[in-house]
């Protein structure tokens, strides 16, 4: 599932909806945008910890902000850090989540939704969660 969820409430909503489908496990790929509301980061980490089985924490338009600082903010209130994999490269995080998943599992890729760029240090790089996920899924076997 791809979703634009970028607030604690929207992340909770998509993960709760996926839980209603009775998945074996939920794998979540998400991050928080840089140079944006820092107060939502720790609550988003808490939602991810509560509602996902494994979380692949990654970049989501870091803009001019240090990505590791964003990760630190997200992880501030997390108590089960073993549920989290920190992977700054978003494509790699998506690939890892798909690689970890098996039949009956759901992978939720949240935060960017329809966006087709990744903003970093003033540069807009072409980037589409949808295209990347589709590419890996079409391979049939992820290598």
Model-identified regions with their sequence ranges:
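ATP-dependent carboxylate-amine ligase
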Residues: 1-143
């Amino acid at each position: 599932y791809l979703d634009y969820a970028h607030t604690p409430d929207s992340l909770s909503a998509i993960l709760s909806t996926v839980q209603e489908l009775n998945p074996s496990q939920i794998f979540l790929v998400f991050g928080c945008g840089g140079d944006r509301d820092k107060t939502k980061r720790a609550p988003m980490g808490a939602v991810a910890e509560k509602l996902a089985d494994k979380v692949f924490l990654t970049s989501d338009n870091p803009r001019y902000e240090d990505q590791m600082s964003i990760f630190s903010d997200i992880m501030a209130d997390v108590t089960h850090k073993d549920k989290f994999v920190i992977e700054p490269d978003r494509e790699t995080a998506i690939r890892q989540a798909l690689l970890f998943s098996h039949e009956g599992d759901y992978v939720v890729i949240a935060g960017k939704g329809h966006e087709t760029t990744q903003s970093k240090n003033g540069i807009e790089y072409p980037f589409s969660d949808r295209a990347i996920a589709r590419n890996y899924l079409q391979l049939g076997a992820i290598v």
